Amino acid sequence: MDIDNPKIPPNSVDSEQSVLGGLLLHNESWDSVVNILSSDDFYQTSHRIIYDAIVTLLEHDKPADILTVKEQVIKSHDEDSIGGFTYLAQIAENTPSVSNIEAYAKHVRELSIYRQLIKIGKEMADTAFSPKDIEVNDLLDLSERKIFEIAEQV
């Protein structure tokens, strides 16, 4: 990475917010998202925390709205870790359309896969630049296995 021109990993704050806002506004949208996303797919740490709180509430058949999510978050995190109640309200207010939540979720997931590929690529490049106790065929096998693990998630 060039210090003068750092590359930001692929992400979309808008898509992440739209997924979260859609879930806050219409809990039934969970059915469209549950098999697409996990909290690890979110780039923003605050969005991971919010998503985990929503999931916890919905899995326990509790409503997930800005108040209940905030209360769930503060059970294990500082409220400031998600930008506070105001940020939750902004997410809900700025959600463009709940009906497109599946498309937003797929976009968030796709960007997550790109980030995973970048991470693996960097790991493989680092290992190839200084191959400590690893044969080239072993590195190829390791690379193939890691990429296959990502492919299985799709």
Question: At which residue positions do the language-model features occur?
Answer:
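Noncatalytic partner-interaction/assembly domains of nucleic-acid and motor enzyme complexes
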Residues: 1-111
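Extended, charged alpha-helical coiled-coil/arm scaffolds that mediate oligomerization and mechanical coupling
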Residues: 45, 74, 85-153
